[in-house]
């Protein structure tokens, strides 16, 4: 009788572990809490580039964005972004 109980517990454990593995291995679908279709962040490229190391900056209203170790960056107008500021604002 003891072996019968052990087999039942082992089968239950295998099914439980398999269920947990299946649930964790599937990608979770994240839903937006904000149902609006308007984007709060709408970056537009400005017609210029920037090189901060040579003190070549973007015009007013545009922000310099560099990728990795590149010397030259692209200027973007960040419409609708209220979190931009200089590091000294912290």
From Swiss-Prot:
Keywords: Disulfide bond, Glycoprotein, Secreted, Signal. GO terms for cellular component: extracellular region. Glycans are attached at residues 55, 77. It is found in: Secreted. Residues 1-25 form the signal peptide. Disulfide bonds join 46-62, 50-64, 58-75. The keyword Disulfide bond applies. GO terms for molecular function: C-X-C chemokine binding. It comes from the Eukaryota. Salivary chemokine-binding protein which binds to host chemokines CXCL1, CXCL2, CXCL3, CXCL4, CXCL5, CXCL6, CXCL7, CXCL10 and CXCL11. This is Evasin P1126.
């Amino acid at each position: 009788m003891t072996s019968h109980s052990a087999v039942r517990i082992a089968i239950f454990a295998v099914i439980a572990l398999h269920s947990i593995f299946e649930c964790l291995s599937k990608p979770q679908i994240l839903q937006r809490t904000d149902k609006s279709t308007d984007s709060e962040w709408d970056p537009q490229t400005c017609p210029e580039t920037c090189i901060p190391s040579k003190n070549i900056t973007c015009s007013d209203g545009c922000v310099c964005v560099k990728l990795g170790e590149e010397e030259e960056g692209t200027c973007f107008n960040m419409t609708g972004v209220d979190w931009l500021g200089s590091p000294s604002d912290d």
